[in-house]
Amino acid sequence: MIDNHRIQFERPNLPELIKENTVVDLHFHSHYSDGFNTVEAIARKAHDLGIGIAVTDHNEIRGAVEIDGYSDVLSIPGIEMTSKEGTHILIYFYHIENLEVFYKDHVIPYMGNEIMSSTTLEMEEIIKRARKFKTVIIFPHPFCGIYTGIQNSYFSEDRRERIFPMVDGVEVINSENMNKSNLRSALLGFNLGKGITGGSDGHRISQMGKVVTYATCKRSRKAFLDAIKKKKTKVVGKEIDLIRKVTSNGVKLRTNLKNYPDLVEKNLKYSYTVINSKSKEIKENVKRSLNGKKRGRQKKYRVL
């Protein structure tokens, strides 16, 4: 059964949310990978909004380490790694020192030629290595239109069934995704019974806070990450407008074509993906939910 209050597809009212909750944009990029802004600008914007921030650069941690030095901003150390299959995974750390060790021992030796390239580690191996540390592991944008989400053709149904229990949750709203993809991500998150997160996936500070994760907990890194694991978090946000999406995705697509054109070509054929699961019950739940959306299209599907 879907909880009608844990995911809201609407613009976050940040001034109200921060009164009684810890609010964090859990997916943001700096100029150290494919983002536009400096960490200083990111920290200033997060402070002005009154929210926490996770700088989750692609295969890179300098942004996460730098923002950890801003004592007036709640930051969640993290990295968005790219597996051998070209699929992304978000790894959040309770301690910045652990992120630095993980990066040195388990990322740098397996890097590709470019920072945005795939590493040489398969998804399962990345997760196993991340589990050596105190972490929260999340699948971002599972239904991303090209290939960077876990619901892509490189992962068979059987393989996904083995991988899903290995992680802590799913990113259910990503401001750079299409609405249909986010709806499917939300359904996947609920049906897996995992923790849920959301983030802007921002590459410019104007995107920060468009999607946030929040919890009624102490304003601390540990309390917030614990809330994700305990499935106490909620997510609110909307997709960015089409013009901004095209601009942002254009940069990403050029980078992706350069680094792994074979994956792009194969996965463009996979743009209309569906949730695959051995569980008949999960399949039926998803079908009913999606059919309900089509029947009620005259009413905006704002809350799941």
Model-derived regions, located:
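Charged catalytic cores and adjacent phosphate/nucleic-acid-binding surfaces used
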Residues: 1-32, 36-44, 49, 64-77, ...
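Active-site neighborhood of divalent metal-dependent phosphoester bond hydrolases
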Residues: 97-115
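Residue-level preference for nonpolar/small residues embedded in alpha-helices
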Residues: 38, 59, 121-122, 181
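Short, ordered loop/turn segments at secondary-structure junctions
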Residues: 58-59, 80, 142, 202
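Ser/Thr-glycine-rich phosphate-binding loops at phosphate-binding pockets of nucleotides
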Residues: 30-31, 53-60
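Hydrophobic anchor at the start of a short beta-strand
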Residues: 53, 137, 196
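Divalent metal-binding pocket/active-site signature
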Residues: 109-155
